[in-house]
């Protein structure tokens, strides 16, 4: 096949994919309107995942800028080697990469300790499980993951609840929800059949919501605008 033929083939594939995506989005929006549903965005975050922490930093601003129903789910890492080969090495690279990205974005990262207080991990998850059905859960989750990735041992300790819930069951249930929707990774946002991973994809979701007329009159704040 000549170079010209390859280029034409690539262009055709791009156009077909764009048209298919547009058609799927139109169908999803029609179904949403017919059902009278809100614009539902599901956020899947993992306590041990620094990418989840960086994404979580912007989620309140996303909810403030767009008329959406933002649902939070705390998940656990998928240790299947088919999805995450060499998980220890991946975790090390994630910490290093997120430290650099956090510095660029001006997000505090392990500024109160050299490492997350992993000794409190299980107790913290159990404490969050005890309020999973409370309207306070989103704020508590975001505050907890912030304390954890700032290395704030004292802050995490204050969040531990003696009357904690069943964190394992909560994680397993949320992981099943994530899998049923067709994904396995954390730091992901799901909206109308599509996935947006990490901070760098957040603007794509924001643009899609804006195109659907879901933006609030005041528009995106400075924090969201800063990641473009």
State each model region's role.
Residues 7-22, 51-62, 139-228:
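C-terminal cap of thioredoxin/glutaredoxin-like
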Residues 23-33:
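A short, compositionally biased domain-edge/stem linker segment
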Residues 32, 67, 71, 175-178:
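N-proximal short alpha-helices
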Residues 34-41:
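A short, charged/proline- and glycine-enriched loop
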Residues 41-48:
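Asp-based phosphoryl-transfer active-site loop
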Residues 47, 53-146, 216-228:
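Structural alpha/beta surface segment adjacent to cysteine/selenocysteine redox centers
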